[in-house]
Amino acid sequence: MKIAIVCYASVGGSGIVATELAKCLVDRGHEVHLISTDPPFRLGEFRTGLVFHRVETPAYPLFREPQYLLSLSNAIVQLSRELTFDLVHAHYAIPHATAAYLARQILSSTSGAHVPKIITTLHGTDITLLGSDRSYSETVAFSIDQSDGVTAVSESLKRDTYRALDVQRDIRVIPNFVDTNRYRRLPPAELRRQICPSGRYEKLIVHTSNFRPVKRAEAVVEIFKRIRATVRARLVLVGDGPDLAKVSRLVQDLKLGQDVVALGEQDQVVPLLSVADLFLLPSQQESFGLAALEAMACGVPVIASRVGGLPEVIDDGVDGYLKDPEDLQGMAEQALTVLGDAKLHERLAAAARRKVEEKFSADRVVPQYEAFYREVLM
Protein backbone atom coordinates (compact mmCIF):
# COMPACT_ATOMS: atom_id res chain seq x y z
CA MET A 1 0.00 0.00 0.00
CA LYS A 2 0.98 3.63 -0.52
CA ILE A 3 0.12 5.42 2.73
CA ALA A 4 0.29 9.06 3.79
CA ILE A 5 0.55 9.62 7.55
CA VAL A 6 -0.26 13.10 8.86
CA CYS A 7 0.93 13.88 12.38
CA TYR A 8 2.42 16.43 14.72
CA ALA A 9 6.21 16.54 14.81
CA SER A 10 6.55 17.44 18.48
CA VAL A 11 7.21 15.17 21.42
CA GLY A 12 3.89 13.62 22.40
CA GLY A 13 2.07 10.33 22.16
CA SER A 14 0.28 10.93 18.86
CA GLY A 15 3.38 11.98 16.95
CA ILE A 16 5.50 9.21 18.45
CA VAL A 17 2.97 6.48 17.67
CA ALA A 18 2.38 7.81 14.14
CA THR A 19 6.11 7.87 13.41
CA GLU A 20 6.75 4.42 14.87
CA LEU A 21 3.80 3.07 12.87
CA ALA A 22 5.27 4.60 9.71
CA LYS A 23 8.61 2.89 10.31
CA CYS A 24 6.98 -0.46 11.04
CA LEU A 25 4.81 -0.26 7.92
CA VAL A 26 7.87 0.42 5.79
CA ASP A 27 9.62 -2.58 7.34
CA ARG A 28 6.57 -4.64 6.34
CA GLY A 29 6.85 -3.60 2.68
CA HIS A 30 4.61 -0.55 2.39
CA GLU A 31 5.50 2.87 0.97
CA VAL A 32 4.88 5.56 3.58
CA HIS A 33 4.92 9.34 3.32
CA LEU A 34 5.03 11.37 6.55
CA ILE A 35 3.45 14.83 6.27
CA SER A 36 4.17 17.35 9.03
CA THR A 37 5.63 20.77 9.82
CA ASP A 38 9.04 19.34 10.74
CA PRO A 39 10.74 15.95 10.80
CA PRO A 40 8.94 14.07 13.61
CA PHE A 41 10.77 13.58 16.89
CA ARG A 42 11.24 9.82 16.46
CA LEU A 43 11.88 9.77 12.68
CA GLY A 44 15.47 8.62 13.16
CA GLU A 45 17.73 7.22 10.48
CA PHE A 46 16.99 6.96 6.77
CA ARG A 47 14.72 4.14 5.63
CA THR A 48 14.07 3.20 2.02
CA GLY A 49 10.34 3.61 1.42
CA LEU A 50 9.81 6.27 4.10
CA VAL A 51 9.63 9.86 2.82
CA PHE A 52 9.13 13.03 4.86
CA HIS A 53 7.23 15.99 3.36
CA ARG A 54 7.41 19.37 5.09
CA VAL A 55 4.28 21.54 5.24
CA GLU A 56 5.16 25.19 4.78
CA THR A 57 2.72 27.68 6.29
CA PRO A 58 3.65 31.24 5.29
CA ALA A 59 2.75 34.07 7.65
CA TYR A 60 0.86 36.97 6.08
CA PRO A 61 0.09 40.26 7.89
CA LEU A 62 -3.59 39.82 6.99
CA PHE A 63 -3.86 36.75 9.23
CA ARG A 64 -3.57 36.89 13.00
CA GLU A 65 -1.76 33.54 12.92
CA PRO A 66 -0.50 31.08 10.25
CA GLN A 67 -3.26 29.12 8.50
CA TYR A 68 -1.92 25.59 9.05
CA LEU A 69 -5.24 23.88 8.28
CA LEU A 70 -5.27 25.39 4.79
CA SER A 71 -1.61 24.76 4.00
CA LEU A 72 -1.87 21.17 5.27
CA SER A 73 -4.96 20.51 3.14
CA ASN A 74 -3.17 22.00 0.16
CA ALA A 75 -0.11 19.80 0.75
CA ILE A 76 -2.27 16.65 0.96
CA VAL A 77 -3.97 17.58 -2.32
CA GLN A 78 -0.72 18.25 -4.16
CA LEU A 79 1.01 15.12 -2.86
CA SER A 80 -2.05 12.96 -3.55
CA ARG A 81 -2.16 14.11 -7.16
CA GLU A 82 1.53 13.39 -7.59
CA LEU A 83 1.80 10.14 -5.63
CA THR A 84 -1.75 8.66 -5.74
CA PHE A 85 -1.95 7.56 -2.11
CA ASP A 86 -4.19 4.61 -1.30
CA LEU A 87 -5.11 6.25 1.97
CA VAL A 88 -4.36 9.20 4.21
CA HIS A 89 -4.00 8.31 7.90
CA ALA A 90 -4.61 11.37 10.09
CA HIS A 91 -3.24 11.08 13.64
CA TYR A 92 -4.93 13.44 16.13
CA ALA A 93 -8.24 14.86 15.01
CA ILE A 94 -7.36 18.55 15.26
CA PRO A 95 -6.72 19.72 12.57
CA HIS A 96 -5.56 16.63 10.69
CA ALA A 97 -8.94 14.93 10.17
CA THR A 98 -10.42 18.22 8.98
CA ALA A 99 -7.50 18.88 6.63
CA ALA A 100 -7.79 15.37 5.18
CA TYR A 101 -11.53 15.84 4.61
CA LEU A 102 -11.01 19.20 2.90
CA ALA A 103 -8.28 17.68 0.70
CA ARG A 104 -10.60 14.85 -0.29
CA GLN A 105 -13.32 17.31 -1.27
CA ILE A 106 -10.90 19.24 -3.46
CA LEU A 107 -9.65 16.05 -5.13
CA SER A 108 -13.22 14.81 -5.65
CA SER A 109 -14.12 17.99 -7.51
CA THR A 110 -11.93 16.94 -10.44
CA SER A 111 -13.57 14.38 -12.72
CA GLY A 112 -11.67 11.10 -12.83
CA ALA A 113 -9.18 12.15 -10.12
CA HIS A 114 -7.74 9.55 -7.75
CA VAL A 115 -9.18 10.11 -4.26
CA PRO A 116 -7.53 8.35 -1.29
CA LYS A 117 -9.48 6.95 1.64
CA ILE A 118 -9.20 8.73 5.00
CA ILE A 119 -8.51 7.05 8.33
CA THR A 120 -8.45 9.09 11.53
CA THR A 121 -6.84 7.89 14.76
CA LEU A 122 -8.00 9.55 17.97
CA HIS A 123 -5.26 9.84 20.58
CA GLY A 124 -6.72 11.54 23.63
CA THR A 125 -6.64 15.27 24.24
CA ASP A 126 -7.86 15.82 20.68
CA ILE A 127 -11.17 14.57 22.13
CA THR A 128 -11.07 14.98 25.91
CA LEU A 129 -9.61 18.51 25.93
CA LEU A 130 -9.80 20.22 22.54
CA GLY A 131 -12.47 18.27 20.72
CA SER A 132 -15.05 18.71 23.44
CA ASP A 133 -14.46 22.48 23.52
CA ARG A 134 -17.44 24.34 22.01
CA SER A 135 -15.00 26.28 19.82
CA TYR A 136 -14.11 23.07 17.95
CA SER A 137 -16.65 20.37 18.75
CA GLU A 138 -18.95 20.57 15.71
CA THR A 139 -16.06 20.64 13.24
CA VAL A 140 -14.25 17.79 14.97
CA ALA A 141 -17.36 15.59 15.10
CA PHE A 142 -18.10 16.29 11.43
CA SER A 143 -14.51 15.50 10.39
CA ILE A 144 -14.54 12.22 12.31
CA ASP A 145 -17.84 11.18 10.75
CA GLN A 146 -16.57 12.04 7.28
CA SER A 147 -13.55 9.74 7.69
CA ASP A 148 -13.76 6.37 5.94
CA GLY A 149 -12.44 4.68 9.07
CA VAL A 150 -11.78 5.77 12.65
CA THR A 151 -9.65 4.21 15.37
CA ALA A 152 -9.06 5.09 19.01
CA VAL A 153 -6.12 4.03 21.17
CA SER A 154 -8.28 2.68 24.00
CA GLU A 155 -11.80 1.62 24.91
CA SER A 156 -11.81 4.52 27.37
CA LEU A 157 -11.17 7.04 24.60
CA LYS A 158 -13.82 5.42 22.41
CA ARG A 159 -16.36 5.92 25.21
CA ASP A 160 -15.18 9.49 25.78
CA THR A 161 -15.61 10.29 22.09
CA TYR A 162 -19.21 9.11 21.95
CA ARG A 163 -19.93 10.88 25.23
CA ALA A 164 -18.34 14.21 24.26
CA LEU A 165 -19.30 14.47 20.59
CA ASP A 166 -22.26 13.68 18.38
CA VAL A 167 -20.30 11.09 16.39
CA GLN A 168 -22.07 8.35 14.42
CA ARG A 169 -19.06 6.65 12.84
CA ASP A 170 -18.02 3.25 14.22
CA ILE A 171 -14.73 3.45 16.10
CA ARG A 172 -12.25 0.57 16.10
CA VAL A 173 -9.95 0.29 19.11
CA ILE A 174 -6.32 -0.36 18.15
CA PRO A 175 -3.97 0.19 21.10
CA ASN A 176 -0.64 1.93 21.11
CA PHE A 177 2.45 -0.23 20.85
CA VAL A 178 6.21 -0.34 21.29
CA ASP A 179 9.00 -2.08 19.42
CA THR A 180 9.92 -4.75 21.98
CA ASN A 181 13.22 -5.42 20.21
CA ARG A 182 14.27 -1.87 21.02
CA TYR A 183 12.35 -1.31 24.26
CA ARG A 184 13.89 -3.91 26.54
CA ARG A 185 16.03 -3.81 29.62
CA LEU A 186 19.67 -3.38 28.65
CA PRO A 187 21.07 -1.59 31.68
CA PRO A 188 24.26 0.38 30.94
CA ALA A 189 26.11 0.10 34.24
CA GLU A 190 28.06 3.30 33.72
CA LEU A 191 24.88 5.35 33.24
CA ARG A 192 23.47 4.00 36.50
CA ARG A 193 26.67 4.96 38.30
CA GLN A 194 26.56 8.46 36.83
CA ILE A 195 22.93 9.19 37.64
CA CYS A 196 22.56 7.20 40.82
CA PRO A 197 25.93 6.79 42.57
CA SER A 198 25.74 3.72 44.81
CA GLY A 199 27.36 5.41 47.77
CA ARG A 200 24.72 8.11 47.82
CA TYR A 201 21.55 6.60 46.37
CA GLU A 202 19.92 3.18 46.49
CA LYS A 203 16.94 3.56 44.13
CA LEU A 204 16.24 5.43 40.90
CA ILE A 205 12.75 6.71 40.04
CA VAL A 206 11.85 8.05 36.58
CA HIS A 207 9.05 10.17 35.14
CA THR A 208 8.77 11.05 31.45
CA SER A 209 6.13 13.37 30.00
CA ASN A 210 5.46 16.56 28.05
CA PHE A 211 5.06 18.43 31.35
CA ARG A 212 1.60 19.73 30.63
CA PRO A 213 -0.88 20.27 33.50
CA VAL A 214 -2.74 17.00 32.81
CA LYS A 215 0.49 15.06 33.57
CA ARG A 216 0.70 16.51 37.11
CA ALA A 217 4.48 16.53 37.27
CA GLU A 218 4.33 18.51 40.52
CA ALA A 219 2.53 15.51 42.04
CA VAL A 220 5.50 13.37 40.97
CA VAL A 221 7.76 15.56 43.10
CA GLU A 222 5.35 15.43 46.05
CA ILE A 223 5.27 11.63 45.87
CA PHE A 224 9.04 11.51 45.59
CA LYS A 225 9.41 13.71 48.68
CA ARG A 226 7.51 11.10 50.70
CA ILE A 227 9.62 8.28 49.25
CA ARG A 228 12.87 10.17 49.88
CA ALA A 229 12.00 10.51 53.56
CA THR A 230 12.45 6.74 53.90
CA VAL A 231 14.66 5.57 51.02
CA ARG A 232 17.83 7.05 49.57
CA ALA A 233 16.31 7.58 46.14
CA ARG A 234 16.88 9.88 43.20
CA LEU A 235 14.26 11.19 40.76
CA VAL A 236 14.99 11.70 37.06
CA LEU A 237 12.59 13.86 35.05
CA VAL A 238 12.67 13.42 31.27
CA GLY A 239 10.92 15.79 28.88
CA ASP A 240 10.00 19.44 28.58
CA GLY A 241 6.85 21.52 28.63
CA PRO A 242 4.98 24.43 30.21
CA ASP A 243 4.96 23.03 33.77
CA LEU A 244 8.68 22.27 34.00
CA ALA A 245 9.53 25.69 35.47
CA LYS A 246 6.92 25.23 38.23
CA VAL A 247 8.29 21.76 38.93
CA SER A 248 11.82 23.16 39.23
CA ARG A 249 10.63 25.78 41.72
CA LEU A 250 8.84 23.13 43.77
CA VAL A 251 11.99 21.00 43.86
CA GLN A 252 13.92 23.95 45.28
CA ASP A 253 11.16 24.86 47.76
CA LEU A 254 11.16 21.29 49.08
CA LYS A 255 14.98 21.31 49.28
CA LEU A 256 15.25 18.35 46.91
CA GLY A 257 17.65 20.01 44.48
CA GLN A 258 20.40 17.44 45.00
CA ASP A 259 18.03 14.50 44.62
CA VAL A 260 16.10 15.51 41.48
CA VAL A 261 17.64 15.87 38.04
CA ALA A 262 15.79 17.18 34.96
CA LEU A 263 17.29 15.95 31.70
CA GLY A 264 14.96 17.71 29.25
CA GLU A 265 13.92 16.06 26.00
CA GLN A 266 15.86 12.90 25.17
CA ASP A 267 15.96 11.06 21.83
CA GLN A 268 16.79 7.80 23.58
CA VAL A 269 14.82 6.91 26.71
CA VAL A 270 15.60 3.17 26.73
CA PRO A 271 18.96 3.57 28.52
CA LEU A 272 17.30 5.66 31.24
CA LEU A 273 14.40 3.26 31.67
CA SER A 274 16.83 0.35 31.73
CA VAL A 275 18.45 1.64 34.91
CA ALA A 276 15.21 2.72 36.62
CA ASP A 277 13.73 0.96 39.63
CA LEU A 278 10.28 2.57 39.42
CA PHE A 279 8.19 4.74 37.09
CA LEU A 280 5.63 7.27 38.35
CA LEU A 281 2.67 8.51 36.28
CA PRO A 282 0.10 10.30 38.50
CA SER A 283 -1.74 11.90 35.55
CA GLN A 284 -5.13 13.53 35.86
CA GLN A 285 -6.10 11.92 32.55
CA GLU A 286 -4.46 9.42 30.19
CA SER A 287 -6.35 8.06 27.22
CA PHE A 288 -3.73 5.32 26.94
CA GLY A 289 -0.44 5.90 28.75
CA LEU A 290 2.36 5.35 26.22
CA ALA A 291 5.01 6.41 28.73
CA ALA A 292 3.85 3.66 31.10
CA LEU A 293 3.97 1.12 28.27
CA GLU A 294 7.55 2.08 27.39
CA ALA A 295 8.59 1.66 31.03
CA MET A 296 6.85 -1.71 31.30
CA ALA A 297 8.61 -2.93 28.16
CA CYS A 298 11.90 -2.14 29.89
CA GLY A 299 10.90 -4.12 32.97
CA VAL A 300 10.15 -1.12 35.18
CA PRO A 301 7.22 -1.42 37.61
CA VAL A 302 4.77 1.47 37.16
CA ILE A 303 2.63 3.22 39.74
CA ALA A 304 0.00 5.30 37.97
CA SER A 305 -3.41 6.92 38.27
CA ARG A 306 -6.55 4.85 37.86
CA VAL A 307 -7.86 7.03 35.02
CA GLY A 308 -8.75 6.77 31.34
CA GLY A 309 -7.02 3.99 29.45
CA LEU A 310 -4.39 3.17 32.08
CA PRO A 311 -6.44 0.26 33.55
CA GLU A 312 -6.36 -1.25 30.03
CA VAL A 313 -2.55 -1.17 30.16
CA ILE A 314 -1.85 -1.97 33.82
CA ASP A 315 -3.46 -4.79 35.80
CA ASP A 316 -3.48 -3.47 39.36
CA GLY A 317 -1.33 -5.66 41.58
CA VAL A 318 -0.24 -7.91 38.69
CA ASP A 319 2.13 -5.85 36.53
CA GLY A 320 1.92 -2.48 38.27
CA TYR A 321 -0.29 -0.49 40.62
CA LEU A 322 -3.14 1.97 40.12
CA LYS A 323 -4.28 4.59 42.62
CA ASP A 324 -6.77 7.44 42.61
CA PRO A 325 -5.06 10.52 41.12
CA GLU A 326 -5.29 12.51 44.35
CA ASP A 327 -3.97 9.68 46.55
CA LEU A 328 -0.36 10.80 46.58
CA GLN A 329 0.26 9.21 49.97
CA GLY A 330 -1.08 5.89 48.69
CA MET A 331 1.21 6.08 45.67
CA ALA A 332 4.19 6.83 47.88
CA GLU A 333 3.38 3.95 50.25
CA GLN A 334 2.96 1.57 47.32
CA ALA A 335 6.26 2.75 45.89
CA LEU A 336 8.02 2.06 49.18
CA THR A 337 6.52 -1.44 49.26
CA VAL A 338 7.76 -2.21 45.74
CA LEU A 339 11.20 -0.71 46.31
CA GLY A 340 11.60 -2.57 49.59
CA ASP A 341 10.63 -6.05 48.36
CA ALA A 342 13.06 -7.49 45.81
CA LYS A 343 10.88 -10.51 44.99
CA LEU A 344 7.79 -8.35 44.45
CA HIS A 345 9.78 -5.98 42.26
CA GLU A 346 11.10 -8.87 40.17
CA ARG A 347 7.61 -10.34 39.76
CA LEU A 348 6.08 -7.03 38.70
CA ALA A 349 8.91 -6.32 36.25
CA ALA A 350 8.60 -9.74 34.60
CA ALA A 351 4.81 -9.50 34.38
CA ALA A 352 5.02 -6.01 32.88
CA ARG A 353 7.40 -7.14 30.17
CA ARG A 354 5.27 -10.20 29.45
CA LYS A 355 2.13 -8.04 29.14
CA VAL A 356 3.79 -5.80 26.55
CA GLU A 357 5.04 -8.76 24.52
CA GLU A 358 1.64 -10.44 24.52
CA LYS A 359 -0.64 -7.43 23.90
CA PHE A 360 1.23 -4.27 22.95
CA SER A 361 4.21 -5.21 20.80
CA ALA A 362 4.58 -3.86 17.26
CA ASP A 363 4.26 -7.42 15.98
CA ARG A 364 0.84 -7.69 17.65
CA VAL A 365 -0.57 -4.24 16.87
CA VAL A 366 0.74 -3.14 13.46
CA PRO A 367 -1.04 -6.05 11.69
CA GLN A 368 -4.28 -4.72 13.20
CA TYR A 369 -3.71 -1.43 11.38
CA GLU A 370 -2.91 -3.27 8.15
CA ALA A 371 -6.11 -5.30 8.43
CA PHE A 372 -8.11 -2.13 9.08
CA TYR A 373 -6.52 -0.44 6.06
CA ARG A 374 -7.53 -3.36 3.83
CA GLU A 375 -11.04 -3.31 5.27
CA VAL A 376 -11.45 0.40 4.51
CA LEU A 377 -10.03 0.01 1.00
CA MET A 378 -12.45 -2.79 0.06
Segments from the language model and where they lie:
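Carbohydrate-associated surface elements
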Residues: 156, 177
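Conserved acidic donor-binding segment of nucleotide-sugar-dependent glycosyltransferases
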Residues: 316-317, 321-328, 337-343
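Conserved donor-binding/catalytic core segment of Leloir-type glycosyltransferases
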Residues: 151, 198-224
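Short hydrophobic beta-strand element within catalytic cores of glycosyltransferases
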Residues: 301-304, 314
